[in-house]
Amino acid sequence: MAERANLVFHNKVIDGTAIKRLISRLIDHFGMAYTSHILDQVKTLGFQQATATSISLGIDDLLTIPSKGWLVQDAEQQSWILEKHHHYGNVHAVEKLRQSIEIWYATSEYLRQEMNPNFRMTDPFNPVHMMSFSGARGNASQVHQLVGMRGLMSDPQGQMIDLPIQSNLREGLSLTEYIISCYGARKGVVDTAVRTSDAGYLTRRLVEVVQHIVVRRTDCGTIRGISVSPRNKNRMMSERIFIQTLIGRVLADDIYIGSRCVAFRNQDLGIGLVNGLITSGTQSISIRTPFTCRSTSWICRLCYGRSPTHGDLVELGEAVGIIAGQSIGEPGTQLTLRTFHTGGVFTGGTAEHVRAPYNGKIKFNEDLVHPTRTRHGHPAFLCYIDLSVIIESEDIIHSVTIPPKSFILVQNDQYVESEQVIAEIREGTYTFHFKERVRKYIYSDSEGEMHWSTDVSHAPEFTYSNVHLLPKTSHLWILSGSSCGSSLILFSIHKDQDQMNIPFLSVERKSISSLSVNNDQVSQKFLSSDFADQKKSGIPDYSELNGNLGTSHYNFIYSAIFHKNSDLLAKRRRNRFLIPFQSIQEQEKEFIPHSGISIEIPINGIFRRNSIFAFFDDPRYRRKSSGILKYGTLKADSIIQKEDMIEYRGVQKFKTKYEMKVDRFFFIPEEVHILPESSDIMVQNYSIIGVNTRLTLNIRSQVGGLIRVERKKKRIELKIFSGDIHFPDKTDKISRHSGILLPPGKGKTNSKESKKFKNWIYVQRITPTKKKFFVLVRPVATYEIADSINLATLFPQDLFREKDNIQLRVFNYILYGNGKPTRGISHTSIQLVRTCLVLNWDQDNKNSSLEEVRAFFVEVSTKGLIRDFIRIGLVKSHISYIRKRNNSPDSGLISADHMNPFYSISPKAGILQQSLRQNHGTIRMFLNRNKESQSLLILSSSNCFRMGPFNHVKYHNVINESIKKNPLITIKNSSGPLGTAAQISNFYSFLPLLTYNKISVIKYLQLDNLKDIFQVINSYLIDENGRIFNLDPYSNVVLNPFKLNWYFLHKNYHHNYCEETSTIISLGQFFCENLCIAKKEPQLKSGQVLIVQRDSVVIRAAKPYLATPGAKVHGHYREILYEGDTLVTFIYEKSRSGDITQGLPKVEQVLEVRSIDSISLNLEKRIKGWNKCITRILGIPWGFLIGAELTIVQSRISLVNKIQKVYRSQGVQIHNRHIEIIVRQITSKVLVSEEGMSNVFLPGELIGLLRAERTGRALEEAICYRAVLLGITRASLNTQSFISEASFQETARVLAKAALRGRIDWLKGLKENVVLGGVIPAGTGFNKGLVHCSRQHTNILLEKKTKNFSLFEGDMRDILFYHREFCDSSISKSDFSRI
């Protein structure tokens, strides 16, 4: 025993860790017996002191941290900014959730770190502080919830609740916080029960993996080691952890300080030597670990190191595997008991913040940092090496060292305030981040109509549903409007865009029956004023419209209907608009019209020269029966070389169109039946039948006449020709008339009779046999191309001839060639003539290289009417076509109040008047999800708001002469819809600037010259591409659009040169909130521009949702969504929430290699990379070996660090060597690839790395394998003992496979011997289970065998090599299962 005088007096607080150190030093110094005597005295002293001080714990001892107030305030400010960005549509829901969690988690962690210094400064003898930080009871997490903040909670599904609990348990929780807190508490109670059983099972699995590992030798002879240094590349290792890693290990290399050797190889490290090495500043120390041991199934004393029980080198025969398994599994049961106290508090892995200690200036070396952005897109600096940051205030200079790969969030020489975040330390990259794929559903906040601002594609697995994939980042908009379902009957009364009174809105989405029409606006459009009395009747009186419907000529009075434009029902397919014409009778009976103008855009949206732009099928040229088309002697030129596809009810046929040069053609009717080959035909060829004769079992003839049967490939054509049969006398006269058309008056001359024909006839010679023939005279339907609707008047030619040289030519096409038969498909009618508009542009222009133009439909709502524009995008040229026009010259003037169903504004005072009451709205028809009933969307005044009036906007009155120079086009006599486009010379798209201030959308528009500035006419509309349309209801004069430029011009006007800032407000444009439309104040709400007037804009309220690529959009474009409907689904990766409660599952996930994306994928990538590079450099055998070795070494170190981190976070100390033994077992296998070794191993077989290496050497051929990471369960089922595997899991399967393969169990492990009742090969039974034989003796045996079976030497070489290697290694290493 040492003398009392030599003892050192330590005056410091002794916590749990210090007591551990004290005990270990006492054992080293005095031995076990004396140490126990000392510890008894310490225990007695402790009880005496506790009794004397009588420490008690009261609620007043829970001291809240003073900095909590401003920390929470700071976090709330950041959350508020984030919420604003989300509201503006700059941040999508998943980003918002992630950032919100990070903000609150960082706040909570900082509070937790502040806790200990706060107690130490204010009240070091606080009972809570003494109790928790000494390790007696409770840990930092629990105290943090008592005096810090409870923080973020997980819900029962493990998802984060993004509303943090800001209070702590000392302050008390609000009602909302209490309910959220109950989630976590319930989760904690359930977890406790489940986890206790899990912990026991984890211990069992761990022991299964390593039960056979026993210390069998003193030294395996390895020369490898693992280098440990206190300053690692990725992180700073604390001195305590460094000492703990080194103590009890054995050195792999000599250590030199200068030229002096201070420690030699195979020396074990004690506390004195470790302290000496640290103080001498040794950079790295190479130590032996279980990873470096050369065996796979056992371990040597030097690689294991000291025994943790008595501090000497471990004894031979020690079952270190079972000790390791229990050391890791046992704290698991401890951890599960702790979960009860803390509940489901989130402790995820996010970045730590470095805050400035006081106000001052920041200084750092700018050459060592690089500008970058954080993961949230904020600008920052990235440092690659340790960076010293100095904070200078008036009298203090404070220095902080920022570790590598961290973000600096402030600039050099910037003034920072106290506690401002100056840097963000990222977690070390050496650990694996556990990630899982999560679906986040975004639900609609309000009812309305869905729009999106980009193209979407159908999700492949939902081709026939309404789920779409977004290809790029874009906004989804929900345009406001309340909907009411309806039956189809209501649509006989209500038309799109009508105003109506709504007595009540049904919240339950029932259909509303008591709707009445307010047809004031409608009557101004197309009805007489006396219609007001008949409002309630529901069927308008169309008597005012003059129309005669002749039965013979089909003379529709198109102009009346076209001008009045009462009900244009646009049937819109994906790329076609049908604009129908209705006869008066059809309108009265609400028939669906049979004909109309179809504007068709090719599916790819590209027009080429001479493309057909629109066509009109006149019902006069429509036939129900089949027949033959004849032009007679008239000419028709095929002007379209490329055959055009025409769609007939889904059946596509190629038709060539022929341009009519003349105004007459003939149709010869015939009845045609196409029958299958096997049909029974009941009539004979060339026989004559009457009407309604049975042709086959189920087909009867509709006309009488001559039967003609033609048998073709796999089908029979049966034709019936109606007409008169004549038997002529002279052949030569008839042959001239065979198959030709005869005009009226020409007679058929016979010897006995002469007959005059009133109509055209078709004479056809028929020859049933070679000698017999007769002539069939068939009736002919004569068609004359009368002036049908003139499509050219829809698009006045003058408009397009000015600058862009667009020509729209009208052609009548006959759809069938001369003499070609026409066939109807399943009782559809056949269109003979089609009136087409062909689009062409001038080839002499300098833009003649333009071979194709893009076209698309633009839907714009203005003045309460939906209009469809077609955009054709030439270079600097547009033509437009408006579907609805309600102010045609014949319909009288419409007052602005009736045109605008939303508001009227008094121009003098600029006072806002709402002309819409709350129960007064506008109907729009929409798709609905359930297709049985359509639904109405009602826009009421609450859904719209007005911007303006813009009093500061001034217009320039320029001299009238310049207007005179520009030709004016009157549209008094032109009938039909008309749109005129004004081209803006330089148009820049708008980009909102992401700032927290007001955002001003300002454009710089340069005018071509001063002549182009004109007085702005009262009302105009701008479509979404910046073109401005003059829609003055009081004016029948349209300014020539290609000589004018219209602008919103602000005040500054220079006399000669005009470059103005102007705000372009496009109709249909979407605005996010907080954009400045006017200069004075930002726009208060987001929405879509609905009406543009001279000094104000009406905007329909809308809410933007930002969505990222790959998000799934539920629903169709313009579909009505109700509040709470699923709008979009995000799929994103999130770090698995590491609850305090989830320490154990994390360990299990690492050991079972269960994480979806992290460990396995990282390992796979690493392996592929190494294998590719190294195989290419070193050749195949070495490449595979070194690639696998490097992969295994890296993954082993990563796994050990990960497991240690989990346990250390819970305050549990486990020696690295225990974890290393487990990890060595789950990383020691390689997977045989399919390419090679088919003669020894099967592809997909798991073998040890050493065995693969040795077998490859013996076989002298390339082995293809790669490292694989097994979980502990798989490793337990892939050992060399089938008895051990069968006693663990799947007993029948394991035994059956072992029997089929003829496996041998060498009974090397403990478990196999226990099962069979033998002596276990550990401890005292260590030497009894081994068979010793000399190397020389075995070699002689093998040689004898080889001589005896020399005949088979060539065939069996592979097996002998394998056996020789097997026996050599087993005898030399005293282990049969080495390979």
Curated annotation (Swiss-Prot):
NCBIfam families: rpoC2_cyan. It comes from Crucihimalaya wallichii (Rock-cress). DNA-dependent RNA polymerase catalyzes the transcription of DNA into RNA using the four ribonucleoside triphosphates as substrates. Its main location: plastid. HAMAP family: RNApol_bact_RpoC2. GO terms for cellular component: chloroplast; DNA-directed RNA polymerase complex; mitochondrion. The gene is rpoC2. This is DNA-directed RNA polymerase subunit beta''. The keyword Nucleotidyltransferase applies. Binds 1 Zn(2+) ion per subunit. Disulfide bonds: none annotated. Belongs to the RNA polymerase beta' chain family. RpoC2 subfamily. Keywords: Chloroplast, DNA-directed RNA polymerase, Metal-binding, Nucleotidyltransferase, Plastid, Transcription, Transferase, Zinc. It catalyses: RNA(n) + a ribonucleoside 5'-triphosphate = RNA(n+1) + diphosphate. Its EC number is 2.7.7.6. GO terms for biological process: DNA-templated transcription. Zn(2+) binds at residues 220, 293, 300, 303.
